[in-house]
Amino acid sequence: MPSVSESDELIFFVNGKKVIEKNPDPEKNLLFYTRKVLNLTGTKYSCGTGGCGACTVMVSRYNPKTRKIHHYPATACLVPICWLHGAAITTVEGVGSIKKRVHPVQERLAKCHGTQCGFCSPGMVMSIYTLLRNHPEPTPDQITEALGGNLCRCTGYRPIVESGKTFSQKSTVCQMKGSGKCCMDPDEKCLESREKKMCTKLYNEDEFQPFDPSQEPIFPPELIRMAEDPNKRRLTFQGKRTTWIIPVTLNDLLELKASYPEAPLVMGNTTVGPGIKFNDEFYPVFISPLGVPELNLMDTTNNGVTIGAGYSLAQLKDTLDFLVSEQPKEKTKTFHALQKHLRTLAGPQIRNMATLGGHTASRPNFSDLNPILAAGNATINVVSREGKDRQLPLNGPFLEKLPEADLKPEEVILSIFIPYTAQWQFVSGLRLAQRQENAFAIVNAGMSVEFEEGTNTIKDLKMFFGSVAPTVVSASQTCKQLIGRQWDDQMLSDACQLVLQEIRIPPDAEGGMVEYRRTLIISLLFKFYLKVQRWLNEMDPQKFPDIPGKFVSALDDFPIETPQGIQMFQCVDPKQPQKDPVGHPIMHQSGIKHATGEAIFIDDMPPIDQELCLAVVTSTRAHAKITSLDVSEALACPGVVDVITAEDVPGENDHNGEILYAQSEVICVGQIICTVAADTYIHAKEAAKRVKIAYDDIEPTIITIEEALEHNSFLSPEKKIEQGNVDYAFKHVDQIVEGEIHVEGQEHFYMETQTILAIPQTEDKEMVLHLGTQFPTHVQEFVSAALNVPRSRIACHMKRAGGAFGGKVTKPALLGAVCAVAANKTGRPIRFILERSDDMLITAGRHPLLGKYKIGFMNNGEIRAADVEYYTNGGCTPDESELVIEFVVLKSENTYHIPNFRCRGRACKTNLPSNTAFRGFGFPQATVVVEAYIAAVASKCNLLPEEVREINMYKKTSKTAYKQTFNPEPLRRCWKECLEKSSFFARKKAAEEFNGNNYWKKRGLAVVPMKFSVAVPIAFYNQAAALVHIFLDGSVLLTHGGCELGQGLHTKMIQVASRELNVPKSYVHFSETSTTTVPNSAFTAGSMGADINGKAVQNACQILMDRLRPIIRKNPKGKWEEWIKMAFEESISLSATGYFKGYQTNMDWKKEEGDPYPYYVYGAACSEVEVDCLTGAHKLLRTDIFVDAAFSINPALDIGQVEGAFIQGMGFYTTEELKYSPKGVLYSRGPEDYKIPTITEIPEEFYVTLVHSRNPIAIYSSKGLGEAGMFLGSSVLFAIYDAVTTARKERGLSDIFPLNSPATPEVIRMACTDQFTEMIPRDDPSTFTPWSIHVS
């Protein structure tokens, strides 16, 4: 190889500061570097795969050709540090900070209430900030698109979008979609009338600081000089195991590729990076040709466009946008098809990192672009050192990786040529994914047809399908047989049969959904057929008939709209003192810190001297005996200090049925067997891979509820309530309907995974733990038991958690004990951060449920008798399963009075990781079954489900089935307001009209009511304590036993203290929750955090005010600070402990009666959806929510909880699907496999109203709203059910069918039975083992 001038110096800038690294390690990424080297912890680790956006940063590069600076978002977890040469990186700290200046983006995100737990907030800030650097006055659509790669589990996205829209040229935060009028304008019909004393503004735009784009930091001039330097040198960075080479010229690149033919070319690292992380791929050499000019050229000719392989997908989209606007429509059909897919392919961060060449070369089977490029006759321009430039057709053989059509190892893709389309050629791209954006396709297709000029005779036809085989496949034989045919219905019928014969998906194919994917192949083909038929009609209306009018809506995918809406809540009494903050929509106490990245989470804490990191080794078998455990290789690995097993537990390894370390037997895949402690997490993880475990399987292995029933395997005794004479009533009803509903589980997907820092103390066997938990006392209990020391020696500190939703009630106790045992054995601090995949595997989630019902009713819809059975899949240990099944049974009537009612429930023991608490605690599962049988009764009676709900709803003060008295008046009010103000009946009529005019798309509406019980039926869990200190300067330090999970609990407690002490809220500070300040605290769950802790804070403050009252009487006109000084001088204690005994709840299961709950939260939600019957996709058009909030202490926080819970519930009922193998292995272990809602799934119109009432039992007559909105998400499920029912009726099918949860596209499509579902081949279940199974 000729001598080349080289350098080993990496130069880049971070937040305006120059960074120089000599020989950086190519295996280190930017996220690690910013957090661990530069101590910039605002950028968060959440998934590690580029799928959540929490680690978003802004990358800025200078292009010497255009002489422009390009700003774009990137996920730091996928960016190798060596990739940064010549780049300027901006992290959230570089945008603004409390110490210096808070940027308007950060301020508005916080003040618009766009943060809750705050873990996703820095990523949200960076996405909006990057957009503003490119578009200082963005459109609402640009804001929505910019946030498409960021996940939030708390807020429901609406306030985040709203904060971004404040930067739009004409703010649209309170405008109807398209009308330009305020939602509250009397002429607008989104809400039919204005409420007296109702407010709609959660923040004051006048408080925002102005945004001046001219004041942003400049791009470092040194980087411009570097980019324009004509004498650039090759860069070579030699790491411990790998070498990273950055060539300067094309010849240099080709020389390197010839010398290292197996070295991957890394441009965006979106393919190579995940392969290294998850598939243990290793490459000794990486070549990164980012700066090679020839890879970044674009050239247009009369025949088409040539686009450089180095173009990012975002640049590709911009180029296509320009070409489509400049060229005649007939020439750009391929470009248009690519444009459409580029809008939803991944998220903006990945689109700005991934390149056209990398995407084309890697040829993933799920590729959205390659099928279209192939259909559009694209060719690949390939070069090599030998000078043998060649054009490789981007066709079936290339995509199927046939050797004769593949790239040679030494070749480099230079560019892609995309020809213009011919006049009589039509190209289309089609896809269907679990959600609209940032999700791999379940099936996609690129199709092209060319006709003999002026005819509908097929001259050429191409069809390529993705996600149906290990590679993208071509239906080439089908296409050959159709050449010369007319484009008509008979051709379509033959094409469907042929393509199903040619493309065979095995019944046990990876990814499952086999029958659905087979259906999608021909459903997408039919869509293409319709598109072409419509296009032919446009070409010559006289010669070619148009498609039927009822088919037109099938042509287009659902558009992505910017959400609009309004929030209504009761205004504060104008007589209330100005400094009293109770009732005001106050920003989250940590909102600004969330947005600036200065809110400290556990892994943001600085490293401690001699700190070790912990990695877990988990079982790969569901039920087996451990025959051997060999840790010798792990112990010999670099940096490893020790391996910890069950033998190292000084105390209890099995505490209350929960096992820290498996010892002789494993009872689920994912059970912890041992942990490895090392100096770095990478060393610990590498060593963990070298632990050798041998097993002998034990029978039976029980995975599903049905298998548990078969083996009589249960975790708890049966729970039962019954009223009336059920058996007698069944004999005296007009009709009986029976059925069963399967409700699958749900992953918490809190943005911050389980995180613990355990620090052994030098004296008295003390241990200090910092962790994110909902239940510090429980952690203390488990650690105490494991270490065999008194609880008083264990101190648990909890500042905040990055989301929890029930997943941090019990699990941190087990994991905390595992961590503490490791710290105890090594005598060194241990940092234990679960990776997302391990977190999802180990901690499990919501209980899957099987519900069976038998309902007796009269022909008018009145239900006289119900016999319901519930079974939950509890997993392998008790955890919270018994309590969950109790809640399921107690809450199983929802809002309905059924005089003869029997409900039974049991928690099943299976060989899955133990399921645990989750927001709603069984209510979201149980009530789906209730509403399902309501819908079944409605169908039998030929009534609307809403009519049956109204008929059977509680109407006056009554007793529940468990004999608790309650007044349903607030329920009736929410129900009535929801029906009226959502214009349900008018919109239902409009939907019917739409459905009559559209065969392949249907709209559905549903209104569901809710009676949600707050707190738990165990009295001692409802107690709380608080500690309040007043300092001599008048400032107040507040602490209590509640945990901040994002719900704003501390903010509300500050409001309470401010009112009770009659001081401004700025005087009150909350530091942390700790077992050393408030011991023996109950868990923060059950929607009761503000209730019980608020009472305790109130009590403490009242005690202090009683002490201060004599002082105040002496000096009534004095200031607070003067009173405090006087009190101190008179030796009056300025500290007080407050206590709340708790709600006195009880439940006697032997008598089947009690008063298990202090009060109920009532509500109703109306949702409207549109369903694509050909694909199973759906779009949520509008949601109206009415929740009985009584008197809201903080409407902004309460509305945030309602909206966030609703979107989380909507995800539970639609997109979120956990997939298990028949052997109990969880497949869904990250955002690429598990799809929580993104910004594109939220309602296009979203209206939330907090209905005022009274609740004298709670503090300030408030109610706990943390969980109530979760079940209301089922209004989307039942709206889908309504739409599918309409489709089935039109097709002559039964309108009673099991629409199980979640209603994924697969479930929806296969329920819409038609000629295409009937056409697909079926397999005998006894002849194969499916790839995945349902566990409910």
Curated annotation (Swiss-Prot):
Reaction it catalyzes: an aldehyde + O2 + H2O = a carboxylate + H2O2 + H(+); retinal + O2 + H2O = retinoate + H2O2 + H(+); all-trans-retinal + O2 + H2O = all-trans-retinoate + H2O2 + H(+)
The principal localisation class reads cytoplasm
**Where, in this chain's numbering, is Mo-molybdopterin bound?**
Q116, C154, A804, F805, L1045, G1086, S1087, M1088, G1089, Q1201, L1265
Q: Which residues bind [2Fe-2S] cluster 1?
A: C47, C52, C55, C77
InterPro entries listed in its UniProt record: 2Fe-2S-bd, 2Fe-2S-bd_dom_sf, 2Fe-2S_ferredoxin-like_sf, 2Fe-2S_ferredoxin-type, 2Fe2S_fd_BS, Ald_Oxase/Xan_DH_a/b, Ald_Oxase/Xan_DH_a/b_sf, Ald_Oxase/xanthine_DH-like
The entry lists its GO molecular-function terms as: 2 iron, 2 sulfur cluster binding; aldehyde oxidase activity; electron transfer activity; FAD binding; flavin adenine dinucleotide binding; iron ion binding; molybdenum ion binding; molybdopterin cofactor binding
Instruction: Summarize induction of expression.
Output: Repressed by testosterone in Harderian glands. In skin, induced by UVB light.
Q: Where is it localised? A: Cytoplasm
Name of the protein? Aldehyde oxidase 4
What's the name of its gene? Aox4
